Amino acid sequence: MRILSILALALAALILASTTTAAAGAPVIKYRDDQFGSVLATPKKQALYYWRVEKRAGGKIRCTGSCAKAWPPLYAKGAVPRKMRGIAGTFGTIRRPDGRRQVTFNGLAIYTYAHEGPTQVLCNNVNGWFVVRVR
């Protein structure tokens, strides 16, 4: 019976590892969304977005004030690794106008949407916001 319990736990861990990828303490994970494929998310599985306005501005922060209330920035807590296992792309940080450091992915600041819950992607291609898809 104990061996069966251990096997069940190992299988559950393997399934979880195949659907999310992150280094311990990493600010983001990768998870599989039925509609959008592999997307970046917070460790609580809240989808991450970039804003086309900032992409066109060469990565400069444009989402401040009421924009940042609706689209909360993903702030860096400590060092952010440039690479994360299982995620093709480069991470970094950018200094926001308020002086705080925000996480970037491939040079673009990344945000959550305040009105989404875990595993929801409600605002892809809405007003220039796009979920961050990864390989």
Model-inferred region functions:
Residues 14-22:
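C-terminal segment of classical bacterial N-terminal signal peptides
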Residues 4, 22-135:
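Compact beta-sheet-dominated domain cores in extracellular/mature segments
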Residues 1-8:
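Bacterial N-terminal signal peptides that target proteins for export
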